[in-house]
Regions:
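Flexible metal-binding regulatory segments at protein termini and peripheral loops
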Residues: 1-130, 226, 251-252, 332, ...
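Juxtamembrane coupling segments of multi-pass membrane pumps/enzymes
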Residues: 2, 76, 184, 188, ...
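Conserved ATP-binding TGD loop and adjacent catalytic N/P-domain core of P-type ATPases
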Residues: 16, 270, 344, 434, ...
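Conserved cytosolic catalytic loops of P-type ATPases
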Residues: 26-47, 55, 59, 203, ...
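Transmembrane helix-loop-helix hairpins at the membrane interface
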Residues: 29, 87-243, 354, 723-725
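Membrane-embedded alpha-helical bundles of multi-pass transporters
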Residues: 111-127, 156, 175, 414, ...
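Hydrophobic alpha-helical transmembrane segments
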Residues: 136-147, 154-157, 171, 194, ...
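P-type ATPase nucleotide-binding
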Residues: 452, 456-586, 596, 608-626
Length: 862
């Protein structure tokens, strides 16, 4: 994917024309243009030469009347800076310097303001009156010549935009004023006072100047508001320090952050921002990570802990080793994800895009038709012209074009500030449509790190001694449960027993010798081979199992030594998070590979009944569970991305939780930086708020044009309602401002607040979970029977435009959504999708499904 900077765009029609021009370039597989950031993202076909294609793209954009250049790191950062508003402010101030005296001259006499004597009268004074207005109007036209230049380029390339409407409206008023001067001259020559009087009051110069100035007012407010939409990213970028204290040959050297290399040791003092991603090598401190995760509580850091750029060291000095620098830091990835999401198109934007593509030609035709109809109805040329100009300048494609992207940009920024990263505009929109949430257990509901929760010793082996002995035995084991015992011993500052003759017995446990005595640890059956367990230990182990805790039994010198309970601890926020999901109208299902007893216990702890727990599922079976849950509606799969990538890809929305520094997980649509399940309902809330905001914006944009165009055309003249061109231009200017301002309200939205949680008002009809999915264990033969369909046929689809794993996931989802398609194996490297069919699916349907996602089908083989 290549990013380009685009110049010269002023409205949604411009963006549509650029997309159309670039889409026709050979070697282009897909293109998305962002009016908000004046940028374009292009996917190349696998056989495209990057340099040649880039040159062709720039030429195509320039031929369409705009400018294009390859984006660089500097230009990407610069695009977040608001350089447009200061320029527009200067234009506005300069325009007002001429407009104010122009309005005094042209309209002051209407409210009793005096005019100089040489402008009064019906003789030469009328000509002076007209020429002074012309002299004050021409500078305004020159100051705002960008409208005329851009508008003419658009007309010339048969791709008119908003600037074409403005330039035609203002230009028509200016030309009519020049015509009026000529007619006044003829009247003076022929001493025709009636002709002079007629055109003296119909000069329209003030309309031309006012249209341009008011549009500039709107553009200035719009630019300012658009600049505010990237405040979240700007605040993140400002947090990153420009310099770093790097240790070179034991000396502290201050270097620009851009010169820090992987492997460098750098020092961070209390109160300083961490310059790059790294790992702590020396020191203990707490770090404020709110900038990246939204977490208000500082996080303790000690040797071995990861640290991220733009987070703030609070109390102790830290020495760290640089791991990720430059564009590879977590901060840079977050900025890139938010920027890329803003550059993509949400499904809701498609309707607006289609309208924008034909909007300007349609409005131009309406304006001409309005002009002709009023002439045919017997109105004066001046009246008909005023109605036509009003239609031109009141029409606003900008409001349509901005309705979706401004909300997406602000919503993405709010998500980034809270550690919720949406990879595309589509994922930001569709997350809120979720019907059911499938939760992986390990690392999602639980911490993913087993901990010792109970130690039961014997009369001869106290708990502390048992833990020390067990730690010595587990020291050489690689099992996850061994790490839990070692961690507990380290927390209690116990020394490990020295173990000799260590041996691991697969599937059973461990054994060795301590001071010449045989020590063994493992499951109950293994320990029974070395000794007879006491009833107390048997009972303690059974209680642990019932509570979802794994019991590890130990023996010493042929006698029972005790039992240690190890469990994957449920996160403190999991139960509340699941409660919030239910309040949002979501059906929540727990998915785990544990046995039924443990699964029931974990489910009960977080508020899930047995009917919403699926146990005994191996990692490879998660995708099948997602597929079956999709019979109930739209599914979101939540996992840590370690062993559930296929399931994340299969779900309508894949949510990776606890990504930390790895925010670019390919399989996920949404990435949660924190390991907090509460961010899942937060993501749903934010998505619904953004969609609600987009609906409001689109309603306003369509409603505004639907009402104002007939109003400007004079449809309501019969009831005394008309609009002159000046009022029409003011209304047009404010329409875009209203849309952007409404989107900016999202900046105040708190996605973690559950105060107003409720099921969505507009969503697909709720469906109960299919009976075969709700089961307590995989051993249940009836409820867990997976319905399979006989595959009758396979087809290979050849596809251009797929570039990565995310492209594969998009095509896979599109194909498997078709009736009769059982599965699809997609490879972006081979450029193919192999579909298994249970019915005869037409090639045209397969092609349409793929091309609806902006990829190109070159052939289908049976």
């Amino acid at each position: 994917m290549q990013r380009y900077e685009i110049t010269g765009m002023s409205c949604a029609a411009c963006a549509s024309h650029v997309e159309k021009a670039v889409s026709a370039v050979p070697g282009v597989a897909g293109v998305a243009v962002s009016l908000l950031t004046n940028s374009m993202q292009v996917d190349y076909t696998p056989d495209a030469d990057p340099d040649t294609t880039a040159r062709r793209i720039c030429n195509a954009v320039e031929a369409a009347g705009y400018g294009a250049s390859l984006a660089t790191a500097e230009s990407e950062n610069a695009e977040l800076e608001d350089t447009e508003t200061p320029k527009l402010k200067k234009r506005l101030i300069a325009s007002l310097c001429f407009l104010v005296p122009l309005m005094y001259v042209s309209m002051g006499h209407m409210i009793g303001l005096p005019l100089p004597s040489f402008m009064e009268g019906h003789g030469s004074g009328a000509m002076v009156f007209a020429l002074v207005q012309l002299a004050l109007t021409l500078p305004v036209c020159w100051i705002n010549r960008a409208f005329f230049i851009s508008g003419w380029k658009g007309i010339k390339s048969r791709a008119p935009g908003m600037d074409a409407l403005v330039s035609m409206g203002a230009g028509a008023a200016l030309l009519y004023g020049l015509y009026a001067i000529v007619m006044i001259g003829i009247g003076l020559k022929n001493d025709d006072m009636e002709l002079i009087m007629q055109y003296r009051h119909d000069l329209y110069f003030e309309s031309a100047a006012t249209i341009l100035t008011l549009i500039t007012v709107g553009k200035t407010l719009e630019a300012y508001s658009k600049g505010k939409t990237t405040d979240a990213l700007k605040s993140l970028m400002k947090l990153a320090p420009q310099t770093a204290c790097v240790l070179r040959d034991s000396e502290q050297v201050m270097l620009p952050v851009s010169e820090v290399q992987v492997g460098d040791l750098f020092l961070v003092r209390p109160g300083e921002s961490i310059p790059v991603d790294g790992t702590v090598t020396e020191g203990i401190s707490s770090v404020n990570e709110a900038a990246l995760t939204g977490e208000s509580m500082p996080v303790d850091k000690f040797p071995g802990s990861p640290v991220s750029a733009a987070t703030i060291n609070q109390n102790g000095a830290l020495t760290c080793r640089a791991e990720r620098v430059g564009q590879d830091t977590t901060l840079s990835q977050v900025i890139r994800l938010v920027r890329d999401a803003a550059a993509t198109k949400a499904p809701l934007a498609k309707t607006a895009d289609k309208v924008s593509g034909i909007f300007v030609p349609a409005v131009t035709c309406i304006a001409l038709l309005t002009f002709v109809i009023w002439l045919l109805l017997g109105q004066t040329f001046t009246y008909a012209l005023a109605r036509g100009i009003s239609v031109l300048v009141i029409s606003c494609p900008c409001a349509l074009g901005l309705a979706t992207p401004v909300a997406i940009m602000v919503g993405s920024g709010v998500g980034a500030k809270n550690g919720i990263l949406f990879k595309t505009a589509a994922s930001l929109e569709t997350t809120g449509y979720t019907d059911a949430v499938l939760l992986d257990k390990t690392g999602t509901i639980t911490t993913g790190e087993p901990s010792v929760v109970k130690i039961v010793g014997t009369r001869n082996v106290p708990a502390k001694f048992l833990l020390s002995m067990a730690a010595g035995l587990e020291l050489r084991s690689e099992h996850p449960l061994a790490r839990a015992i070692l961690k507990e011993a380290e927390k209690d500052k116990l020394s490990y027993a020295t173990v000799a003759d260590f041996e691991a017995v697969p599937g059973k446990g461990l054994q060795g010798k301590v001071a010449g005595k045989v020590i063994a640890g493992g499951n109950a059956d293994f320990i029974r081979e070395t000794c007879e367990l006491t009833s107390d230990l048997e009972r303690a182990g059974e209680e642990m199992s019932r509570d979802g805790v794994t019991p590890l039994y130990f023996s010493l010198a042929g006698k029972p030594a005790g039992v240690i309970g190890v469990s994957d601890v449920v996160k403190q926020t999991s139960a509340e998070a699941i409660s919030q999901m239910k309040a949002l109208g979501l059906q929540v299902v727990l998915l785990t590979g544990d046995n039924a007893a443990t699964a029931k216990h974990i489910g009960a702890m977080v508020g899930l009944d047995e009917d919403h727990v699926i146990a005994g599922v191996l990692p490879a079976g998660k995708e099948a569970e997602v597929r079956r849950l999709q019979a109930a509606g739209r599914v979101a799969m939540v996992g840590d991305g370690i062993n559930d990538a296929p399931a994340l890809t299969r779900a309508e929305t894949g949510i990776a939780i606890g990504a930390g520094a790895d925010v670019a997980l390919d399989a996920a649509d949404v990435v949660l930086v924190r390991s907090d399940l509460a961010d899942v309902p937060a993501a749903v809330r934010l998505s619904r708020a953004v969609v609600r905001n987009i609906h409001q914006n689109l309603f306003w944009a369509f409603f505004y044009n639907a009402v104002c165009i007939p109003l400007a055309a004079g449809v309501f003249t019969g009831i005394g309602i008309t609009l002159n061109p000046m009022i029409a231009s003011a209304a047009m200017s404010l329409s875009s401002v209203c849309v952007v301002t409404n989107a900016l309200r999202l900046n105040t939205f708190n996605p973690r607040s559950a105060a107003h949680d409720a099921p969505p008002k507009h969503k697909a009809p709720a469906r109960e979970l299919p009976a075969e999915t709700v089961c307590e264990t995989r051993s249940c033969p009836v409820k867990n029977e997976i319905k399979t369909e006989e595959v009758t046929m396979k087809k290979t689809i050849h596809i251009e435009g797929m570039m990565c794993g995310h492209c594969e996931a998009t095509v896979k989802k599109a194909l498997e959504a078709l009736d009769g398609v059982q599965s699809a194996e997609v490879s972006h490297e081979k450029g193919t999708a192999i579909v298994a069919l249970t019915a005869d699916v037409a090639d045209a349907d397969l092609k349409a499904a793929v091309e609806a996602k902006d990829y190109t089908v070159t052939g289908i083989d049976a």
